[in-house]
Structures are given as C-alpha cells and as structure tokens.
C-alpha cells in the first residue's frame, strides 16, 4: 500500500503527457494539411467541413477553395483578425452568418465565386455590409438576380473591383450600383442582360473597365460613358452601336464589339482616344455607293428612347457611316468575318496612326492603293480569304507601304500583283500568297513597267524573310526566282513538280533557309537521292506527301531539328543513315505512313534510343505479308528475314534441284515401263543367282 501514492502520481503524469502529445499531434495535422508560407495559408481541396482553427493567428491571406464548408458561421474566422485576402471559391456556401466578418476589419479582397449565396442572400448581404475596407469582391457564379446583387452591394462604397459574372442578371437600372463611387472595374459577362436603362452607370464616376460580353443586348444607343477606357460588348446580339453626339472628350481606348450582328460601322465618339477596335464576326458593310442618294428622306434612322416619362428621339444618317467618328488615334482595327464588298474612299485616310488592319474573310473583290490609303504607319495587313482579283496601285506612287512588315494575301483570286508593289514595301518581312493561281516572272520586271503584270517577281526583296506559296499551281522553278533575298522561311507545298526532282533552284537561298516546306511537290518519283548538304542553317524540313524511296542526304547540315517524312515510299531505315551526325542531332522526326519492310529497319533501334520519333506508335512495316507496328518487332533482325539475306542464286538452286531429280527418276520409270523388251534385257543382265 505504501507504493500506491507513487503509482498514482506516475499514472497521472503519464496521462498528462499522453494528453499533451495527442493535442500536439492534432495541431500538427491541422497545420500539416494546409501550406503556410509567409502569412499565407493555402488550404484548398482538403475536404474541410469547417475553417481550420490551428493556423497562425497573424495570417494575412487564407485560401479555402474547393472545400465543402456550406456555412460560414459567426465564429469561423474569429481566430484570424488580420486577414486581408480571403478566398472561398467553390465551397458550396449557401449561408454566411450575420457576424461572420465582424472581426475582419482589415479584409480587402474577398472571393465568393461559384457558391449558392442566392439561397440566403439577405443574411449574406448583412454579413458583407460589415466589411468597410473591402476593395475587391467576386460574386460570380451564385445565381444572383439584379435585386439580390443590389442588396449585397449596398453601402459597400469602398469597392473598386466587382465581378458579377455568370449570374442571372437581366435588367440593369441605377439602383443596382448605387453608392459605388469608387468602382473602377465591373465584370458583368455571361448573364442574361437584355436591357440597360439610361443612367444605370452614371453614378460610377471612376469606372474605367466594363465587361458586358456574352449577354443579350440588342443595341447600344446614346453611349455616353466618357470616363470609360475599356468596353467589351462581344458575343451579344448588337445591331447598332451609337455614341452620344456630343463634343465631350471620351477616354475610351479599347472597344470590343466582335461576334455580334452589327449591320453598319459603329458611330463612334466625335472626340476620343480609341486605339483598338474589334469588329470581327458581324454582318457589317458599307452601303453609300450602293444607295440612290436622290431620296434623302429615306437615308436616316430614328431611335426612340423611352426613360420613364421622358422620350428622346435620336436621328442618324445611315450612309454617314464613319464620317463623324474620330479614328485619328486608332492603331488596331479588326473587321474580319464581315460582309464588306469595298472600302469607301477616304475611310483609311481617317486612320493615320493605323498599324494593324485585318480584313480577312470578307467579300472584297478589289483594293485601290492610293496616297495615305492605307496609311504610312501600317505594319500589318491581312486581306486573306476574300475574292480579290485586282490590286490597283496609283501611278507614280512610291513608298506607300514603306513600313509594312506582314502582308497576307492568301486564298484569293489573284493572278499577279501591280509592278513595283512589293518593292515599294521596302520593310516587308512576311508575305503569304498561298492559294492564289499566280505565276512567277521568268525575269526581273522593270519598275517603270506600265502594263498590268500577270506574274509576281520576288527578286531583290532584301527585307523578305518568310514567303508562303502553298497551293499556287506553280510550274517548275527556273533562273533562281528568289535571288537577292535572304529568306529564312519558305513554303512551296502543293505545287506538283515545282522542283523537277532537284533542290538546285533553291541554291540562292539555301545558305539562309531555316524552315523549308516541300510537302506534296512530287519529289522522289524517278529522281535521284535528294541532297540538302548545302542547307547549312536548316532547322525544320517538311518532305511529307512525296514519293521518296530513300533518306535525303544532310552532310554538313548539323542545325536540323525537325524532319517530316510521312506519306512517302520509304521501305528501309538503314543503320548507316541513322548514324549520320545531322540525324543524330534531331529533336523531332515523323516517319509514319511509309511501306517499310520489316527486314530493312535495322536502324530502328538507334532511332528509338534518340527518343525523337513523334509518331512512334503509328509506324508500321510489312513482315511476311502482315502489317505490324515497328515497336512490336523483336530486338535484332526477325528470324523470318534470314532467308532474305542468303544469296539469291544459291537459294533458287537449293529450291529447284530436288524437284529436278524427282522429275528425272519419274521420267525414267515411266519410260522403262512402256519399253518392256528393254526392261527384260536390263533385268536379265542385272540378274544374280540365288543361293536357293
């Protein structure tokens, strides 16, 4: 009994140690699940049902994304009073208790995207109203209506950035954003907005960026947000965009009206700073030249604007088109995928600062190049996929395209270009004339040649670096048509017979070429082995779709990185070819869709070792009339191929000799059977006496 107190003390001591140990383990586990670095606690995707309580109290940022929290209770965040950033993205939240943010006096950024806050929006709104320093709020993806959003944003005058994207907003008025005088950026994309009342944004005096993409707005009339710098109204159903007819200076710099149903060029502010205008994928056209101007009363459209008891009528001249718009600062204009049949006279003159013009996928049939049209500042012009059959260059005009660097004329109906057009573009580096039925001039055309040219001359274009002539129906090249250029990229694909089985017509640009595409040009059909030894800087070579029966030579071309030999007539992968230094330095090679013989792929193992075959699983070969994947071949030459290595004469001798001997014996027996006297004589002479 005297030892009982001692045992009790020891037991109590061990219980305390065990309890402290267990508590320490729990704390370590709660911190171990979250990544804590420099006052940032990242607890995303940990399947947490509540906010962890064991994180550092001085944490400034807490990320709880993708956890099934469901409810944010009053006490959930009490342990972290210094939070400045809180992210609760995709937490299944349907309720935020009244005092959940009561202790969060420092919170500036709050993300509540992709939750279910519409279910208890009044209580959640009460919780948000306690955040007096909040600057950024993300409420996207919560099924909020405009009334719910208005209640949640009420009294949050400190907000600078708000996202209400992917909700169910339909109609906006001045009550939704009331009191948000400091708001700079507003994201309303992917809602169901079909109407915006006049004055809905008038109280947002500091608003600079507005995103209304992916809604159902049918038109924007009397646009007067002069302070706005960025406006995105793409992917709506706009048929009209009309800025207010006032002399106030607009700050708008970027306007995106792409992917709508615009019928006319937008009427832009009369005084503005617009430098980027996106109008692709609409139904725009210029109609002045198509309309009978003798009926002025039919040349206007009137818009009736009803705002409460006030009715305004806006009258717009339909054929005025662009005349009153300020385009002087415009640098980037995209009008691709429209229905433009022509560009009005003077249109491009109003854009002296224009550097990028995209007109692809329209209905243009001709283009006149005059003084200041296109403007001298233009560096990139895309006229691809139109119906251009004529390019007109004003007589005596030189240097009109002196700053042009990228010129795309692909997929048109051009047969030639005006003499001197490319030489006036003295800075051009990239030219795409693919899919035009042009022909190359057999000799240099004089610059003072006045007759329309029916061919194209690329000689002596010193600045040209990239040229695409894919699918132009060109005949065999003669007399070095690229002489005087320093081409690094050349595409001659789909011009059958253009090289006439030899790469010698490219000798003038061979030292500078880095990327060469000779896809589907008829190489290898009855021609000698292709030799690219003179192409010392070649990095990429496309020889697919030809009839090559052997690997091309690359002696001295150590820069080669990519080689495409698909869809040829290669039957073997010799070891000697694979061991060449240029092929050993390859990074990517394509070899599929060739009729390889499995008995001739001894170089396959070395290629696999280099790990450069991009279409490895698609390469097949023929083994005993069976098509199998080369990766399934056993190491070394298959057993079935050994007979193929024996001398052919000896093979046939071994095959025929037994047949001949058998035939000789059979013939002798038959002959003797029908010659009975002779047979008896042989028997009598070959008869031996028996011992019996």
From Swiss-Prot:
It comes from the Eukaryota. Glycans are attached at residues 74, 155, 232, 292, 309, 312, 408, 500, 622. Belongs to the LRRC32/LRRC33 family. Its main location: membrane. The gene is Nrros. InterPro entries: Leu-rich_rpt (IPR001611), Leu-rich_rpt_typical-subtyp (IPR003591), LRR_dom_sf (IPR032675), SLRP (IPR050333). This is Transforming growth factor beta activator LRRC33. Keywords: Cell membrane, Disulfide bond, Endoplasmic reticulum, Glycoprotein, Growth factor binding, Leucine-rich repeat, Membrane, Repeat, Signal, Transmembrane, Transmembrane helix. It comes from Rattus norvegicus (Rat). Residues 25-650 are extracellular. LRR repeats lie at residues 58-79, 82-103, 106-127, 133-155, 158-179, 182-203, 206-227, 228-239, 251-272, 273-294, 329-350, 353-374, 377-398, 403-424, 427-448, 463-484, 486-507, 512-533, 537-558, 559-580, 585-605. It is a single-pass type I membrane protein. Residues 1-24 form the signal peptide. GO terms for molecular function: receptor ligand inhibitor activity; transforming growth factor beta binding.
